[in-house]
Amino acid sequence: MMKLAKILLLFFCLLGQQTTKAQKMYQWELFPSYHNALKTVCSKEKVYALCNGNLLSYKTADQEVYRYDKTNLLNGFKISFIKYNKTVDKLIIVYADGNIDLMTDNETVVNIPQYKNKLINNKEIYGVNITGKYAYLATGFGIVVLDMQQNIIENTYILDFKVNATAIYNNKVYAATERGIYFAELDKNLMDKKSWQNLSGHYFTELMVFDNILFGNNTRASLFVLNEKNKTFDATDFKLINAWQITDGMMMAANSQNIYIFKNANEWNTIKQNNALQDIDYKNGVFWGASGYEGLKPYRINSDNQMEAVGEAIIPNSPVRDYANFINFAGNRLLVVGGNLNYNGVNYEGTVMYYDDNKWTNFQDGQAISDKTGLPYINTVNIAQDPRDENHHFVTSARLGMYEFLNGEMVRHYTCDNSRINSILPFDVERKKYVSTSGAMYDNQNNMWFINNQVDTIINVIKADGSWVKIYDEKIKGYPTFDFIMMDRKGRVWLNSRRHSQGIYMLDFNGTIEDTSDDESYFRASITNQDGKTYAPFGFYCMTEDQNGEIWIGTDVGLFVISNPDEFKNNNFVYTQIKVPRNDGTNYADYLLNNTNVTCIAVDGANRKWIGTTNGVYLVSADGMETIHHFTMENSPLISNSINSIAINHDNGQVMIATDKGLVAYNNDAAKPQESMEKSNVKAYPNPVKPEYNGYITIKGLTQNSCVKITSSNGQLIHEGVSNGGIYTWNGRNKQGKRVASGAYSVMATTENGKESVVTKIIIIR
């Protein structure tokens, strides 16, 4: 009894002191965007919304919002369609890759991967029609019939051309295709192409049956109705319909000005609206609108016969978009920009945001900035946070100059006409659309460095006092694709030229920004390794300095290391290409990640390397000799194998991964080590450990390679090991692999040299 009382006393003492957020070690977290609501459907208990291809639900009874992703219930990502089948009370979730989930309101999910796994090139599904217990899927080759009650694919009808939509009407299957409208009798052999007849040449993206009439919709034209007598479709006066739904015995059709609510095919009410609804549904007297970036909104018809919002928009705190091309930590704040240098001609909406204290803050966006500048706001590529003011940021862009933000609002747009930035086409009337800026960083003197591409002077510095310095170097004059800029521990500046005049550039300015007379610089376009093997990479994609001062380089032909940056200027300089022994008795070794497209590299608290590629993420040991993990879409919750950027929170070890589909986090077991062992820094979490918890217990705030011993209250050694950087993890088990009993356990952490140690307590309750 006394022992239990002591444990409870320690429990309440620790509860009062506990300030560290419990982070589940080795777990994944996704950060989907829920800002752009495009589709909505209602079930008996919930309203579902599809936002940027991500799913959420709103439970009207208790106003609970639930987010679904690959780490909880779903079996995929990037959803194309959702439809609710009231006959079987299931939601069908169709993914962009052809995968299918069926989900009930009580959140039981059945995955149907058969269509995704078919050996066909185009697996996209273009439309879903619900009739009875069936879902008819319009595909790139025909129609797939899914029995939603039995959770099986029942039939496949191959037409050999793209189908946009389907409908069942008067014992016939209708298909809106790229070649017009086709139909077939339901009692015929629908797998026989001869059973299908062409009805008309109309092009529709949607088909629906209402009031025993078949409707077709072309969002660029009008709603049409089938004239069976003439075997054609007749246009109606309802034009540019972009939201269309049938529910509770009524049909709703909306464009940018009106919502038409049909009681039957010949009787309707016209509701004025200016909400730009993307989709609409109805439940218990409330219209639910997918209102784009205004979120999921509830509406009612007011006395003026207008749609009026009757509640707050449902927009969970999240990134504004699933764009994450470059990420970086400033302290514990994750900075994110979406966009790229536009090599492939794709323009991404300007996207700048940060994640801090479990909350997303999205900067001023889109049209508001374009209205101020008179220019498009696209392809933001890099960001630097002012060390003197965490609310002050500079953001570079691929072609439209540089933006300065204060408290998330743009306060200045730097162009070739109002600053010392230069244009690629200085004499062109459209010169402000050809101002290429990239890589941005602050040095330890609060000077902001950035790149101005494809002009005579590439390197620019806005000094701490606001004055501007341009550092000219003939070697790199006019180079078009410098990407990132970084400063090593000796104050040298490094740039990677991604492609077109690609290579690695180093500038040693000897600490004198304005005096270029003592500068030394070097540019290397090719790579020769320690074995004399020479490479000419098409792309130099990334560079990072590790804890030993080595610089790791990622290219399209693999991974290389500048082992001693002091030697980069030497004529006989060679890169190190890490060789991993095969250990098969042959004495042979293989180059680490040879011929792998290495896109980004980050260094964790244990000096291990997190390497992003076009085939997932690798975690390798500090020296690269051991591959600890290779995470892919196939073996983890990673949402894409195409990795853009990786950043690590050195306080808690969390690894943030930016992919071409959005952001993912992995709770890593290595954080930046402390300089000295201080009791105030050493914390364990979760603490206390409650009965339902089965995960790892984390001890943080340690020095490099700390020796950790965990003992019971009677002094028995339960567990021991060495920290990864500043973190040590324990699975709550003894040396025999059994879960330890309730009690107070002592954690003794000692520095690598044995001179300093601290003791903390962990309370475990079983």
Question: What do these predicted regions represent?
Answer:
Residues 22-682, 717:
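Carboxylate-rich, polar loop motifs that coordinate divalent cations or form catalytic acidic clusters
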Residues 757-762:
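Edge beta-strands of extracellular beta-sandwich domains
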Residues 70, 723-754:
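Short, surface-exposed loop/turn motifs with a glycine/proline- and acidic-biased composition
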Residues 707-718, 745:
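Short, glycine-anchored, charge-dense loop/turn motifs used at functional sites
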Residues 1-27, 766:
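Bacterial Sec-dependent N-terminal signal peptides
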Residues 676-709, 727-730:
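Glycine-centered coil/turn sites that cap beta-strands in beta-rich domains
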Residues 668, 700-702, 750:
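Residue-level recognition of strand-loop junctions within catalytic nucleotide-signaling folds
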